[in-house]
UniProtKB/Swiss-Prot annotation:
SUPFAM superfamilies: RPB6/omega subunit-like
Identification of the protein by name: DNA-directed RNA polymerase subunit omega
A biological process term (GO) from this entry: DNA-templated transcription
First-tier enzyme category under EC: transferase
Source species: Gloeobacter violaceus (strain ATCC 29082 / PCC 7421)
Keywords of this entry: DNA-directed RNA polymerase, Nucleotidyltransferase, Transcription, Transferase
Amino acid sequence: MNQPVVETAELMRRVEQLVDAAANRYRITVQVANRAKRRRYEDLNDDDGNFKPVLRAIFEMSDEMNEPEIIGD
C-alpha cells in the first residue's frame, strides 16, 4: 500500500497553526496524538487509511479550527 504524497509546506503550515492557536503546546500535542490513536482503532475497515493517523488528525483538527461549521454539534 503506497502512502499518498503530503505537501510538506502545507503540513507544516497546519501544524504551526494548531500550535499557535493553542494555549499549551504540550496539550495540543497530546490532543493530536489521542485523536490519531482513536481514529486508528475506529477506522480499521476504512478505505481512507492511506494517510497515517497522525497526519489525518492534524488535517482534521486544523480544518475544524478554520471551519467550525463543519463540526456537527
